Amino acid sequence: MPSLKDLRNRIASVKATQKITKAMQMVAAAKLRRAQEAAEAARPYAERMDAVLANVSASISGADAPPLMAGTGKDDVHLVVVCTADRGLAGSFNSQIARLAREHIRKLQANGRQVKIITVGKKGYDLLRRDFGKLVIDRIELREVKQIGFANADAIAKKVIGLFEAGEFDVCTLIYSRFKSVISQIPTEQQIIPAAVPQAEGESTGAIYEYEPDAGAILADLIPRNIAVQIFRALLENAAGEMGAKMTAMDNATRNAGEMINKLTITYNRQRQAQITKELIEIISGAEAL
């Protein structure tokens, strides 16, 4: 049984930890608001970009489609870009993304496909290196970036497109966590090469559009930008999801610390009461002996 001194030290230690988790919860809450606003602001742009691509791509035939949309015509080598956080203390946020990545990679391998991996975020590599360390061809960390910008996503997109143009892979899939709410983040996989151009919505108005330069040249310029936009959106969604998961995890940790403090305090009071009672009995017994 721990002594009263040990219990006092444990209570003080847990209280110090509780202060830290509470502070981290408040910081995550402040960052969450900014990250959520950025993620929600990026969605309309990404959706509008899809609509523009759908309209332009509808006017060209498959033979005229740029390579990033037409693909290589093969399905042998797959590049998987796994986006996670650079830091932990976010509950199951990173492990859920890694779980989806493992399932996707193993499914490809079971079908005889060769897999290459790029990890964006330190935790992604840490979680995947045991099973797929030899498949990782590049590691990208953004821990020094205070606020994710389009330039970060554009650099990743250029790296991926460069690998495609060098014949390093046939299909590229992006895996990240889509932000739904503070307590809900959805691991998502999205094919970005060959670019999955959505069908144009709505009924045809009969209008005839002329593109200058031709539609193929416009697509050749738009698709690389769209790949960067989709990666940027994934990074923003990830950032919002990470802050939401971290805020929830720190809130739970703060609550658990409070419960532990209460239990330790009760134990401390009981032992102190027992010790006082024992001392009183000893004093009374001594007085009676006299």
Swiss-Prot record:
Subcellular location: Cell inner membrane
Function, in words: Produces ATP from ADP in the presence of a proton gradient across the membrane. The gamma chain is believed to be important in regulating ATPase activity and the flow of protons through the CF(0) complex.
The gene coding this protein: atpG
SUPFAM superfamilies reported in the protein's UniProt record: ATP synthase (F1-ATPase), gamma subunit
Main location: membrane
Subunit-level organization: F-type ATPases have 2 components, CF(1) - the catalytic core - and CF(0) - the membrane proton channel. CF(1) has five subunits: alpha(3), beta(3), gamma(1), delta(1), epsilon(1). CF(0) has three main subunits: a, b and c.
Species classification: Bacteria, Pseudomonadati, Pseudomonadota, Alphaproteobacteria, Hyphomicrobiales
GO BP, sorted A to Z: proton motive force-driven plasma membrane ATP synthesis
A single GO molecular function term of this UniProt record: proton-transporting ATP synthase activity, rotational mechanism
Protein name according to UniProt: ATP synthase gamma chain
GO cellular component: plasma membrane; proton-transporting ATP synthase complex
Family indicated by similarity: Belongs to the ATPase gamma chain family.
Membrane topology: Peripheral membrane protein
Keyword terms, alphabetized: ATP synthesis, Cell inner membrane, Cell membrane, CF(1), Hydrogen ion transport, Ion transport, Membrane, Transport
InterPro entries: ATP_synth_F1_ATPase_gsu, ATP_synth_F1_gsu, ATP_synth_F1_gsu_CS
